[in-house]
Amino acid sequence: MSLLTEVETYVLSIVPSGPLKAEIAQRLEDVFAGKNTDLEALMEWLKTRPILSPLTKGILGFVFTLTVPSERGLQRRRFVQNALNGNGDPNNMDRAVKLYRKLKREITFHGAKEIALSYSAGALASCMGLIYNRMGAVTTEVAFGLVCATCEQIADSQHRSHRQMVATTNPLIRHENRMVLASTTAKAMEQMAGSSEQAAEAMEVASQARQMVQAMRAIGTHPSSSAGLKDDLLENLQAYQKRMGVQMQRFK
C-alpha cells in the first residue's frame, strides 16, 4: 500500500458515512494526485462543511496544507489552529512537545506512527498544531505518520462506542438504529439508481421504505417491527444491480 493510500484510508476512517464522505474522498484523491492546487479554495470549502467535528476538520486541513504546494507566506487558518490546540490543556501541550522532540529524530512514516501511537489523541492533535503553526518542522512522511496515529486513536474510540450501541440490549435503541440504517440505505439506493428506466423499480422500493420508516416513527411501533428492514432493502438493491449487470455482493 502506498503512503498516500494509507493516509487516505486512515483519514476517511474518522469521517462519518454519507454523501459528504464521498465528496471528501474525491477531494483527497485529487489533492494526492496533484489535480487540486488551490489551497485557499480547498480550506474555505472545508471550513463550511456541515456535520464534521472541529477536530476532523483540523486534521483534514493539516493534511491539505501538507500536500498542496502553497506560497510560503500563506496565512494559517484559525479553524485548524483552534482544532489542533489540544483543548487548551497544558498537559497535552507538554506531552506534544516531548513527542515532537522524538519525531524530529525520526525519518520514516511507520517509525513516526509507532512512536505517536503511545500518546493520547489530545497530545497528538497538539503536536500537529505545533507543526501546523510552524513552531516545529518534521519531514512530510513523519507528519503523515502523526496524522495516521491520531486517526487510529479516534477510530478506536468510535469503534468501541459503535460496538456498545450494536451490542446494546435496549430494544428501543436497537429499533431506532435499524430504522436509521434502513432510511440511509434507501437514500443510497435512490442516489445509485440514477435516471435509467430500470431504476424506477429501485427508486420505488427505496421511496416506500422511507415512507414506511416515517410512518413507523409517527405512530410508534413495536421494537421488533424493524427487524430485517435494512436486509430486505439490500436484497432489492442487489437484485436491481444484477439486472443492470453489476455484481456487488459486499453490502451487508
Swiss-Prot record:
Alphabetically ordered keywords of this record: Host nucleus, Membrane, RNA-binding, Viral matrix protein, Virion
Where are the stretches annotated RNP-binding? 165-252
The motif Nuclear localization signal: which residues?
A: 101-105
Q: Which GO terms describe its molecular function?
A: RNA binding; structural constituent of virion
What result is annotated for mutating A167T? No effect on filamentous virion particles morphology
Mutagenesis / variant outcome for changing V205I: No effect on filamentous virion particles morphology
Query: According to Swiss-Prot or TrEMBL, what is its membrane topology?
Result: Peripheral membrane protein
Instruction: Report further notes.
Output: Most abundant protein in virion. When expressed alone can form virus-like particles in transfected cells.
Instruction: Give the function comment from the record.
Output: Plays critical roles in virus replication, from virus entry and uncoating to assembly and budding of the virus particle. M1 binding to ribonucleocapsids (RNPs) in nucleus seems to inhibit viral transcription. Interaction of viral NEP with M1-RNP is thought to promote nuclear export of the complex, which is targeted to the virion assembly site at the apical plasma membrane in polarized epithelial cells. Interactions with NA and HA may bring M1, a non-raft-associated protein, into lipid rafts. Forms a continuous shell on the inner side of the lipid bilayer in virion, where it binds the RNP.
Subunit and partners: Homodimer and homomultimer. Interacts with NEP. Binds ribonucleocapsid by both interacting with genomic RNA and NP protein. May interact with HA and NA. Cannot bind NP without genomic RNA.
Name of this protein: Matrix protein 1
Q: From which source organism is this entry?
A: Influenza A virus (strain A/Udorn/1972 H3N2)
Chain's gene name: M
